[in-house]
C-alpha cells in the first residue's frame, strides 16, 4: 500500500500516489478530501471529494494559477473538521508546492520557512527549482492579498497554524543540526582513519639502520 502520508498541520497531509489509494490510511486519518496533482490526475475512490489538477513536475509548469483553488479546497475541508490529503506521484515536488503555498497563507511564514516547516514533517519534501521560484514570487507579490482574501471569505482562522508550523520549523532545524554534527563527526573519523593508514604505510616502508 502507501509508503506513509505525513501530517503537516491538523487535518492536512502529504502523501504519494499509493497513499491516495490506501483506504486504511485514509480512514485512519479521517480523510474525506483528496487534492490530486500529477499528469493524469483523476478521481479514484468513491465517497471522496476530489480536486484534480493535471500538471507535470516540470520547472516551467505554472502552479501559481492553481494556488487559490487549492488553498480554498484545503481550508474548507479543515474547517469541516475533516482530513485533506494532497498528493502527486512521489509526494515530493508538486504536492509539496501547493501545501507550502497554503502554509504561507495561514501563517506569516516566507516560502523558505514554510518549506522547512513541511520538511520537518516530511523530510523528502523538495519542490523543483522552478516551483521554488514560483513560491518565492508568490511570497513577494501575492501572499498578502491571499491572506486578506482567506480571512474575508472564511473568517478568523480557528487553528493554531502558526504555532504548529513553528514547531515543525524548529524540528527541521534540529534535524539539520544533527545531520551536520553527524557529517562533521564522520569527516573527523575518516580523517583519523586516513592518518592512521598513512602512518602504517610509512612504518611498513621504513627500516632501522
Curated annotation (Swiss-Prot):
GO terms for cellular component: cytoplasm; nucleus. It is found in: Cytoplasm; Nucleus. The keyword Oxidoreductase does not apply. Residues 4-144 form the Tyrosine-protein phosphatase domain. Residues 170-193 are annotated as: Disordered. It comes from the Eukaryota. It holds the Pfam family DSPc. Residues 177-193 have a biased composition (Low complexity). Coiled coil: none annotated. InterPro entries: Dual-sp_phosphatase_cat-dom, Prot-tyrosine_phosphatase-like, Tyr_Pase_dom, TYR_PHOSPHATASE_DUAL_dom. The active site is at residue 88. It catalyses: O-phospho-L-tyrosyl-[protein] + H2O = L-tyrosyl-[protein] + phosphate; O-phospho-L-seryl-[protein] + H2O = L-seryl-[protein] + phosphate; O-phospho-L-threonyl-[protein] + H2O = L-threonyl-[protein] + phosphate. Activates the Jnk signaling pathway. Dephosphorylates and deactivates p38 and stress-activated protein kinase/c-Jun N-terminal kinase (SAPK/JNK). Belongs to the protein-tyrosine phosphatase family. Non-receptor class dual specificity subfamily. This is Dual specificity protein phosphatase 22. It comes from Xenopus tropicalis (Western clawed frog).
Amino acid at each position: 500500500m502507501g509508503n506513509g502520508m505525513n501530517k503537516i498541520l491538523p487535518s492536512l497531509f502529504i502523501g504519494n500516489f499509493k497513499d491516495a489509494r490506501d483506504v486504511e490510511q485514509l480512514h485512519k486519518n479521517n480523510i474525506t478530501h483528496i487534492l490530486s496533482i500529477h499528469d493524469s490526475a483523476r478521481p479514484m475512490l468513491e465517497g471522496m471529494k476530489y480536486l484534480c489538477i493535471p500538471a507535470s513536475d516540470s520547472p516551467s509548469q505554472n502552479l501559481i494559477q492553481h494556488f487559490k483553488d487549492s488553498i480554498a479546497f484545503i481550508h474548507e475541508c479543515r474547517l469541516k473538521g475533516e482530513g485533506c490529503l494532497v498528493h502527486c506521484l512521489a509526494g515530493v515536488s508538486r504536492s509539496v508546492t501547493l501545501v507550502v503555498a497554503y502554509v504561507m497563507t495561514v501563517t506569516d511564514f516566507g516560502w523558505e520557512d514554510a518549506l522547512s516547516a513541511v520538511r520537518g514533517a516530511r523530510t523528502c519534501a523538495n519542490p523543483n527549482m522552478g516551483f521554488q521560484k514560483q513560491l518565492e514570487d508568490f511570497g513577494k507579490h501575492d501572499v498578502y492579498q491571499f491572506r486578506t482574501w482567506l480571512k474575508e471569505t472564511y473568517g478568523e482562522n480557528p487553528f493554531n497554524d502558526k504555532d504548529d508550523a513553528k514547531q515543525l520549523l524548529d524540528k527541521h532545524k534540529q534535524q539539520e543540526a544533527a545531520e551536520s554534527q553527524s557529517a562533521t563527526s564522520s569527516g573527523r573519523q575518516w580523517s583519523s582513519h586516513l592518518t592512521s593508514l598513512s602512518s602504517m604505510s610509512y612504518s611498513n616502508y621504513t627500516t632501522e639502520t
